[in-house]
A protein has these predicted regions:
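Catalytic core of soluble alpha/beta enzymes
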Residues: 164, 169-282
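Conserved, mostly hydrophobic/aromatic
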Residues: 3, 41, 65, 104, ...
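Flexible, glycine/charged-enriched surface loops at secondary-structure junctions
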Residues: 77, 120-123, 212-219
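Catalytic domains of carbohydrate-active enzymes, especially glycoside hydrolases
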Residues: 153-162
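Active-site mouth loops of central-metabolism enzymes
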Residues: 131-146, 189-195, 238
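N-terminal small/glycine-rich loop or linker at the start of catalytic domains
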Residues: 40, 91, 115-140, 174-184, ...
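Structured beta-strand/loop patches that form or line metal/cofactor-binding pockets in enzymes
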Residues: 1-40, 44-45, 49-50
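Metal- or metallocofactor-binding catalytic centers and their adjacent structured scaffolds
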Residues: 37-115
């Protein structure tokens, strides 16, 4: 079996208005489907992260990566991935290049599953557990009252874990008062603070028993600063959404920069690299 073509399909999915209203609603969510076609008629489907620059990712996939892998055996996933990494070394180690590689790599696993007539999780060694809890990831709201209302809405739908996107103590207090002590709350702040500001905020938030505090420091790769935050608070620190490489995650672990690793499978190179990062956490 040989790869005959790589196709990148940009999507723009309209976002519905939400109640309560949020500055994050409206517009479209951009994403890219990646199709790996073969000479035997089997096609693999993957997904590439594309927030903010979808056409740039499409260009990397179709103009840079496709010429490298057309003609290769799609079932030799490690080989194809190695060719992509080496062929994009100068510009593809992070960001858009890694997003593009991720989409193709995920499509290769989908293709392998179709050839073997097995779900990908079985190809990876089987399920460790039959179910996982899901959390509701809330939008960012303009008032504590809106936060409380959104929390009550999702708890009524059955969620027992909620992730907030606020950057103030009052909103977290309102959320905790709205849901009571038995619902887990996480807080994703999207990298707003210096390490010193983050330490002060983390300590101020401790009474509300956050399950984790996510990405509290700018820039997100300031792992030394994040390590200071992690050492100064009882709240677990989550990070890694903006990291693109196994080696970056190794540095997070080495510096003890946080407690919860959050690799995005469409950002770090796909399923194979994701598994290696999970092994680091173990």
């Amino acid at each position: 079996m040989k790869i005959t073509a790589i196709e990148a399909v940009p999507l723009a999915i309209p976002l519905k208005p939400m109640t309560p209203p949020s500055p994050w609603t409206g517009g479209t969510r951009k994403q890219i489907y990646v199709l790996v076609h073969t000479d035997e008629g089997v096609t693999g489907l993957g997904e590439a992260f594309a927030y903010g620059a979808p056409l740039a990712v499409v260009s990397v996939i179709e103009e840079s990566l496709a010429p490298l892998v057309v003609g290769l055996d799609p079932l030799a996933i490690e080989k194809v991935v190695d060719v992509m990494h080496r062929g994009t070394m100068i510009y593809g180690r992070r960001g858009l290049g890694m997003f593009a590689i991720s989409g193709i790599e995920i499509a290769l696993w989908d293709l392998l599953g179709k050839v073997r007539n097995a779900p990908v999780y079985e190809l990876l060694g089987g399920a460790l557990r039959p179910r996982l809890p899901a959390y509701a990831s809330l939008l960012r709201y303009e008032t504590p009252e809106a936060v409380a209302g959104a929390c009550r809405h999702f708890v009524a739908q059955g969620f027992r874990m909620l992730k907030l996107h606020q950057t103030d103590v009052a909103s977290v207090r309102a959320a905790r008062e709205a849901v009571g002590p038995d619902v887990e709350l996480m807080l994703d702040t999207n990298c707003p603070w210096t390490p010193y500001e983050a330490i002060a905020m983390a300590r101020a938030l401790e009474p509300y028993r956050l399950f984790w505090l996510e990405e509290p420091v700018w820039p997100p790769e300031d792992y030394a600063g994040l390590a200071r935050v992690a050492a100064a608070t009882e709240t677990p620190i989550a990070l890694g959404e903006n990291e693109s490489t196994l080696y970056g995650f190794n540095e997070i672990v080495r510096q003890r920069a946080g407690d919860v690793l959050q690799p995005s499978i469409t950002k770090v190179g796909g399923i194979s690299e994701f598994k290696k990062i999970a092994a680091l956490a173990q």
